[in-house]
């Protein structure tokens, strides 16, 4: 048997595999248009639809941020208690008194 033949893509087709950032952005916008059907809208309808989508995404992010900010102190306190709980738990399994350590 001979050596395997390796076929490399031409330079013209490299952008298909590794698109430039702007091409990638255009591709994502095209996918959004096709998925949501906004390519059928007029410019005004598309503007209103995109504005509503933007507001919904913004408000969802805002709500998630406010929930995370409220939960963060209690999660931080919980994360500081977990190691001491496991330390005392494993010490009790080993039969050692955790208070003497």
Curated annotation (Swiss-Prot):
<dbReference type="InterPro" id="IPR024512">
    <property type="entry name" value="Ser_palmitoyltrfase_ssu-like"/>
</dbReference>
<keyword id="KW-1133">Transmembrane helix</keyword>
<dbReference type="GO" id="GO:0005789">
    <property type="term" value="C:endoplasmic reticulum membrane"/>
</dbReference>
<protein>
    <recommendedName>
        <fullName>Uncharacterized membrane protein C23A1.05</fullName>
    </recommendedName>
</protein>
<keyword id="KW-0472">Membrane</keyword>
<keyword id="KW-0256">Endoplasmic reticulum</keyword>
<feature type="transmembrane region" description="Helical">
    <location>
        <begin position="75"/>
        <end position="95"/>
    </location>
</feature>
<dbReference type="GO" id="GO:0030148">
    <property type="term" value="P:sphingolipid biosynthetic process"/>
</dbReference>
<feature type="transmembrane region" description="Helical">
    <location>
        <begin position="52"/>
        <end position="72"/>
    </location>
</feature>
<dbReference type="GO" id="GO:0017059">
    <property type="term" value="C:serine palmitoyltransferase complex"/>
</dbReference>
<dbReference type="GO" id="GO:0005737">
    <property type="term" value="C:cytoplasm"/>
</dbReference>
<dbReference type="GO" id="GO:0008047">
    <property type="term" value="F:enzyme activator activity"/>
</dbReference>
<dbReference type="GO" id="GO:0005783">
    <property type="term" value="C:endoplasmic reticulum"/>
</dbReference>
<keyword id="KW-0812">Transmembrane</keyword>
<dbReference type="Pfam" id="PF11779">
    <property type="entry name" value="SPT_ssu-like"/>
</dbReference>
């Amino acid at each position: 048997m001979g050596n395997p033949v390796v076929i490399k893509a031409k330079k013209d087709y490299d952008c298909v595999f590794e698109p430039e950032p702007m091409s990638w952005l255009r591709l994502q916008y095209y996918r959004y248009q096709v998925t949501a059907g906004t390519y059928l809208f007029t410019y005004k309808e598309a503007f209103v639809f995109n504005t509503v989508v933007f507001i919904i995404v913004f408000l969802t992010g805002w709500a998630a941020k406010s929930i995370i900010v409220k939960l963060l102190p209690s999660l931080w306190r919980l994360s500081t208690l977990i190691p001491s709980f496991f330390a005392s738990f494993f010490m009790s399994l080993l039969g050692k008194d955790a208070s003497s350590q």
